[in-house]
Amino acid sequence: MTTRKDKPLNIYHTLVSIIIPVYNGANYMKEAINSALAQTYKNIEIIVVNDGSKDNGETERVALSYGDKIRYFHKENGGCGSALNYGIKNMQGEYFSWLSHDDIYYPNKIEHQVDILNKLDNKDTIIYGGYELIDEKGNSLRYIKPDSVLPINKLNISLLPLLRGLIHGCSLLMPAKYFHEVGIFNEALPTTQDYDLWFKIFRVAPIHFDESILIKSRFHSEQGSKKISNHNEECNVLWSSFLHELTEEEMIKMEGSSYLFLTRTATFLSNNTPYKKACDLANTMAKQVLNDTKVSIIIPVYNRINWAIEAIESVLIQTHKNFEILIIDDGSTDDISELTAICKKDKRIKYFHKKNEGPAAARNLGIKNAIGKYIAFLDSDDLFYKDKIEIQLKFMEENNFIFSHTSYQKINEKGKYIESVHSGLFSGNVFPQVIQTCPIAMPTVMGTLTLFQENLFPENIRSGEDCCLWISIASKNSIGGIDKELSKVRISGGTNTFMDPNKYSVGLINITSYVLNDSYLSKFSPFTINLLLAAVTQLRLLENKNKDYKKSNISFFKNNYVIQKIRTYCFVTKILILLTITSIRQEGIRATIFRIQRWLKKHI
């Protein structure tokens, strides 16, 4: 076998070696050889290797009838792999093309693939495609099209099409250099020698899928894989070895995560093969990947130590055991001795003390010290269900999300049920709608460490800082939602946004300001109108707390049609919003309402 030296390759003149291994193949081999001779690309050599056929010389007579049109070799029987290796050692071409003695090439097989190579920068690329399945008599059964199974971009990811059973060895056009660099067929494998070698080569070689059908593959009862009794066991061993040898990096490249690769491989093996042992191994490895995935749970604490301890206890009973808890004491003034004592008892709990700067700064400190693949947040007055981390982690790995949240349950100060909030229905591409309605609650969130390292909480905001970050993340990513209550959010008078109209309205104003001051988010400023309407409504609640709320609310919304009209005037919306924010902060709600009404009469 010759190899390329350091010389430029004129691809149109490169020699392609077509190797035809045959054992007792007189019945079909003439069709195979004729299809090779009929190739429109003429710079080929056809090598026929007789693997010790025992058919009274019929195979040899057919081969010799072609004279010098082919290169014919006879050897002792050693199996298909040994026959291919014999041909490889004697080939002179720069490229290798396998043709089984019972298969057929379309006339343009080699020319078409060489044309593709000529258009590619990397001439060391392996070309492959689908095939036509035919019966013993050559009748067409169906077409096997890999692009009907995987998208084109995935068909060009080395290894993935192989591990989804989409590679037919006779469809390949492969540089011969890989036989030198990686090796040749394992002759000890009677029926899996092809996938064994392709696996080794595809780990180092680029591949290119071509949608053209260029070969006919014959399906018949005399094929080796159907006659060799231990074929299934050999396949189980082979596929199990694949799973053990693959690196995490390779799995991630193929499917986005090792867990997703393993579960999809298990599904493929279960649905398409009888290789139960390999399938069970893939499932076992997938479960282990989840078990080995560390989740960092960040709990900022400011006083209310008894609730903080309850929050910690809800984490300690999680069914997913691989976690760390980062307690960020944001300058508590209460006695924290009981809290620190609990932290010292469990090595999974890390305690940090800092001066009081608000929840955003506390969470950011946790993010900077987290080591898990994922981060989950839990406010010190809230609780996790015991299977929260397990369910959400599996959901994110299965769907390849980098951010997710769930539905939750509201409870009162004593932990009693108030209502269920199905916020988990909010999912997918939710931007820019998330600006005007953000139902994502802090203790329901889980995201990758990398995501939060690149997107910290805005520390200059103490109310609404969480929604600001969720909006920013949603503007660049799809949001995963689980409509299952996995957290409990405590509603407590005076300290909780849900129960404090002033805190709630300030949060809405902060979110609006955050959006308007961001160069990208500000393009969607009309979506902040509802935030300001809600803020104004909440502030009127404070102003009219001793009046008939229903009456005053109806009176206020008499002007609602005017506000709706603003949506069609994007050029004035930002001005109005900025004026509103400034007015509310400096002059109060009564003056602001009067100012808005006067401004609208003048400009709209």
Positions of predicted regions on the chain:
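N-proximal low-complexity "stem/linker" segments adjacent to membrane-targeting elements
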Residues: M1-L37, K287-L316
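C-terminal subregions of glycosyltransferases and related glycan-biosynthesis enzymes
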Residues: T2-I11, P161, L166, D196, ...
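Acidic donor-binding segment of Leloir-type glycosyltransferases
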Residues: I33-H74, I312-H353
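Glycine-rich, basic loop-to-helix element that forms the pyrophosphate-binding segment
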Residues: G57-E60, K75-M91, H112, K354-A370, ...
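Conserved nucleotide-sugar donor-binding catalytic segment
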Residues: K89, G129, Y143, D147-F242, ...
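Short aromatic/hydrophobic "clamp" motif used to bind/position activated sugar donors
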Residues: F96, I375
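The conserved acidic donor/metal-binding loop of glycosyltransferases
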Residues: S100-I104, G130, D379-L383, S407
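Conserved donor NDP-sugar-binding/catalytic core segment of glycosyltransferases
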Residues: N108-R142, D387-I418
